[in-house]
């Protein structure tokens, strides 16, 4: 029995270089021009107050063109991170991040327990917010949320490090 392909609609790179914030959806597929010769793909997993939560796929290519078959075989790499989607997809002067598709049947439930912490980094009490927007009325101690990432957008240093580590594990081979 053949595995059913996900329901993904794909468009060409630069077909629509800018995506306004209000049109970014959970399940969107994006392409990021990681270097002059390399593109990487990923997916929007959720939305939090400060941006969108994404995760990269294990697909590194010399071209921003991808097929549904390639996406159906893709695995997530690294950790889920929050990006400043307004700046990257809507207002960037250089369109190195583009929404290139959408997975209609995307199921975010495997990420329902993904949470981030918020609060004063120097403080003693913190809050917790989940990917689906749930918040906990309880205040947590530093120890209780120590293993969580901050509900804050990460910059290129963080997401490029994730990608560089993956490439290093492959012996710097993109494909």
Where are these regions (language model features)?
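Short solvent-exposed strand/turn elements
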Residues: 52-77
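Beta-strand-rich cores of mature extracytoplasmic or soluble domains
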Residues: 75-175
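Ordered hydrophobic segments in well-structured contexts
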Residues: 26-31, 38-45, 53-59, 79-84, ...
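Short N-terminal edge-element motif at the start of the domain
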Residues: 1-50
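Residue-level signal for the start and early helices of compact helical domains
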Residues: 4, 15, 21, 35-36, ...
């Amino acid at each position: 029995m053949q595995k059913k392909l996900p329901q993904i609609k794909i468009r060409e790179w630069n077909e629509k270089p800018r995506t306004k914030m209000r049109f970014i959806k959970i399940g969107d597929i994006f392409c990021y021009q990681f270097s002059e010769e390399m593109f990487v793909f990923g997916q929007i997993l959720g939305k939090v107050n400060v941006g969108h939560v994404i995760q990269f796929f294990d697909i590194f290519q010399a071209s921003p063109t991808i097929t549904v078959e390639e996406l159906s075989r893709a695995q997530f790499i690294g950790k889920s991170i929050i990006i400043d989607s307004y700046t990257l997809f809507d207002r960037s002067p250089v369109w190195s991040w583009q929404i290139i598709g959408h997975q209609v049947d995307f199921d975010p439930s495997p990420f329902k327990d993904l949470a981030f912490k918020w609060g004063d980094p120097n403080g003693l009490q913190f809050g917790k917010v989940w990917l689906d927007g749930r918040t906990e009325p309880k205040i947590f101690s530093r120890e209780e949320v120590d293993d969580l990432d901050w509900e804050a957008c990460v910059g290129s240093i963080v997401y490029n490090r994730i990608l560089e580590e993956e490439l290093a594990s492959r012996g710097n081979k993109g494909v």
